[in-house]
C-alpha cells in the first residue's frame, strides 16, 4: 500500500476529484478526513468508506475560515494522532460567482481558491513539523498557466496564485522536510456538465488525446505526489490535461 498508516486531509472531498482522491487514499492504506461544506454528501462518502472497512470521517469546513482550519487539523490529530498529507482540493469555478467584472466575484474566487490554500498550507505545515516530514498537494488548474477570455478573470488569477504560492511554500517548508507541489488538471466531465455540446466537443478536439479526463486520473497523480515515492520532489507542477497545454 502506497500510503500505509498515513493520515490525510482532503478538502472538497465530498464529490468530484476530491472524492476520488479520498477513496483512492483509503484504498492505499491512509486514514482520511474529508473536509467540505456539503455536509450530507461528505458524511455519505465517509460512511461509505467506513462501511468498506476504511478509515474516514467528515468535518464540515469553510476553507476560507482560519478558525475552521484550526478546528479541522485539531480534530484530525485528536482522531488519528498525526497529520501526514494535506490535499488542498476545494475550489469554485467562475460560473459560481457570476459577473466577471464584479469585484465581489473576484474576491470570492480569490478567497476560496487561493487564500484557502495559504491558510491550509501554513497550518498543516505547522502540524507536520514535529514529524519532520509531510506532503502538501495544492490543486490548481491548467488555467494557472494560461489565461483565457472564456473564463472568469478571477478564476485564472486564483489558480495562478496557487501555482506560485506552492513554489514559495516549497522553499519555506522544505528545510522542515515538508514537500509542497501543485497539480494542474485539464478538462474533466464535471467541469463541462453545464456547457453546451459544441463547447464540450471543442475542448475534446483541442486535447491531443481527444477526450476529457476523469477524476480518478487526477487522483492517481495526487497520490504519487502525496506518497513517499515522490520523496525528492517539491515545488513542482504536475499537469494532467491530456496534452491540452
Where does each model-flagged region fall?
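Short, small/polar-rich loop/turn modules that mediate ligand/substrate recognition or access, typified
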Residues: 174, 179, 233-235
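Active-site helix of classical SDR
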Residues: 121, 158, 166
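Alpha-helical segment proximal to the catalytic Tyr-Lys
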Residues: 126, 171-172, 231
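Substrate-binding pocket helix/loop in short-chain dehydrogenase/reductase
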Residues: 96-107, 203
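Canonical Rossmann dinucleotide-binding motif of NAD(H)/NADP(H)-dependent dehydrogenases/reductases
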Residues: 3-33
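Residue(s) in the substrate-gating loop at a strand-loop-helix junction
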Residues: 141
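C-terminal substrate-recognition "lid" of short-chain dehydrogenase/reductases
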Residues: 2, 118, 211-245
